[in-house]
C-alpha cells in the first residue's frame, strides 16, 4: 500500500479525465492565496469545507417542498442536496469530468436557501423591497433575494465567523449559475444545474405520491411513456440521455424529447403542487412569519447576532436577510414565538387566592 498525495491525484486527472474537464492544476484559484494541502487537490478541499460548514448542517432542517411534514421520509433541503450530488457525480464520472469539482458544487448549491423553501425566498425579497421603497412586484423587487447569490455570499464572507470558506472560483461559479439563465463556465457546473432539475422533479413527485396528493396516473401520459413509471426509472432515463447526448455534443445537453418531457413534468408540478393544493396551505403563515421577523429585526439590530453585522454596515436589510435566511424552519418559528407569544410567569400561580 502507498500514499497517493495531491501531486499523484493531479497526475491521475491528466490521464483519466476528458480533455474538456476542469483540472485542479488549472483552477483560477481562490480569492485569498493559501498553502496547498499535501493530500487533497483544490476541489476536494472545497468539497470537504462545504461538508463541514454550519450552513450545510442547517439544510437538514430546511423545507424542500412540504412545510413541516409529519412523516420521516419526506425530503429536506439536505436530502435534496445529497441526491443532486449523487446524480451529478454519476454523470460526471460517465463523461470523464472532474468529480471533486462536481460534488463540491452540488453540495454547496443550496447553502443560501431560506427557511420554508421558495416561499421563504419570495417573502424575504418582498420584505426587502418594501424596506427599500421598491415595488415588490417589479422584476427588481421580486429578485432582491436569490438563494444562489446567497449561497455564494455564505461561502465568500459569512461562514467561519465572517472569514468565508475561500473556495475556488470554479466552485463559486457553479453554485451561482446552477439556476437561472446564466450557464456555468465549467461543464461540471452545468452538470449540477441539470442534476438539480432532475432531482427535484423526480423526488417532488415521489414525495407528493407518498403524501397522497398525486398518483402515477395523475402524471402526464407522454413523460410517463418516455421516461418511465417510477422515480428511479425517470432518473435513470434522464441521466442516460444526458450522458449520450453530451458525449456527442461536447457540452452538457439533453435530447429535445427528454428535455420537453422533463419540463412538462415540471409544469405539471407547478400547476398541481407548488402553487396550490394541500401542500401549500401553510405557506401564507410561513410568508407572514418571515416578513414579521424581517420587519422587527431591521429596526432592532441589537437582536441580530454579531457575526451577521460584520458586513454591509449601513445596510441593515442585507444584514437581517443574512440572519433570517440562515435560520432553519424550527429556529425561525422559535424566534417568531419569542417575539410574539407572551411567556409564562412562574410565580403567577402563587399569588392566586
Listing of model-derived features with the role each one plays in the protein:
Residues 1-77, 81, 85-91, 98-99, ...:
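Histidine-centered, transition-metal-coordinating active-site segments
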Residues 102-107, 193:
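Short alpha-helical catalytic segment bearing the HExxH-like zincin motif
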Residues 108-116, 199:
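Short active-site segment of divalent metal-dependent hydrolases/proteases
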Residues 119-125:
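Membrane-interfacial alpha-helical segments at the cytosolic side of multi-pass membrane proteins
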Amino acid at each position: 500500500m502507498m500514499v497517493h498525495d495531491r501531486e499523484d491525484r493531479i497526475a491521475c486527472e491528466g490521464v483519466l479525465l476528458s480533455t474538456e474537464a476542469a483540472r485542479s492544476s488549472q483552477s483560477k484559484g481562490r480569492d485569498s492565496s493559501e498553502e496547498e494541502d499535501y493530500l487533497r487537490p483544490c476541489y476536494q478541499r472545497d468539497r470537504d469545507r462545504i461538508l463541514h460548514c454550519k450552513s450545510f448542517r442547517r439544510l437538514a432542517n430546511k423545507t424542500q417542498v412540504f412545510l413541516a411534514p409529519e412523516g420521516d421520509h419526506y425530503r429536506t433541503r439536505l436530502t435534496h442536496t445529497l441526491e443532486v450530488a449523487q446524480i451529478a457525480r454519476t454523470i460526471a464520472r460517465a463523461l470523464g469530468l472532474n468529480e471533486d469539482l462536481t460534488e463540491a458544487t452540488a453540495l454547496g448549491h443550496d447553502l443560501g436557501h431560506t427557511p420554508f423553501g421558495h416561499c421563504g425566498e419570495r417573502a424575504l425579497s418582498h420584505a426587502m423591497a418594501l424596506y427599500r421603497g421598491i415595488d415588490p412586484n417589479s422584476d427588481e423587487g421580486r429578485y432582491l433575494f436569490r438563494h444562489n447569490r446567497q449561497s455564494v455570499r455564505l461561502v465568500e464572507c459569512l461562514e467561519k465567523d465572517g472569514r468565508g470558506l475561500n473556495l475556488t472560483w470554479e466552485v463559486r461559479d457553479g453554485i451561482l449559475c446552477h439556476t437561472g439563465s446564466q450557464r456555468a463556465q465549467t461543464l461540471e457546473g452545468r452538470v449540477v444545474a441539470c442534476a438539480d432539475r432532475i432531482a427535484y422533479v423526480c423526488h417532488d413527485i415521489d414525495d407528493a405520491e407518498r403524501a397522497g396528493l398525486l398518483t402515477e396516473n395523475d402524471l402526464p401520459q407522454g413523460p410517463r411513456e418516455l421516461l418511465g413509471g417510477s422515480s428511479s426509472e425517470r432518473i435513470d432515463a434522464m441521466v442516460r440521455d444526458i450522458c449520450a447526448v453530451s458525449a456527442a455534443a461536447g457540452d452538457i445537453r439533453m435530447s429535445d424529447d427528454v428535455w420537453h418531457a422533463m419540463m412538462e413534468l415540471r409544469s405539471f408540478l407547478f400547476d398541481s403542487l407548488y402553487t396550490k393544493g394541500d401542500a401549500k396551505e401553510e405557506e401564507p403563515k410561513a410568508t407572514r412569519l418571515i416578513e414579521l421577523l424581517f420587519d422587527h429585526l431591521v429596526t432592532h439590530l441589537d437582536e441580530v447576532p454579531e457575526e451577521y453585522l460584520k458586513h454591509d454596515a449601513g445596510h441593515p436589510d442585507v444584514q437581517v436577510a443574512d440572519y433570517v435566511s440562515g435560520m432553519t424552519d424550527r429556529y425561525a418559528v422559535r424566534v417568531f414565538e419569542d417575539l410574539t407569544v407572551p411567556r409564562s410567569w412562574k410565580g403567577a400561580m402563587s399569588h392566586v387566592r
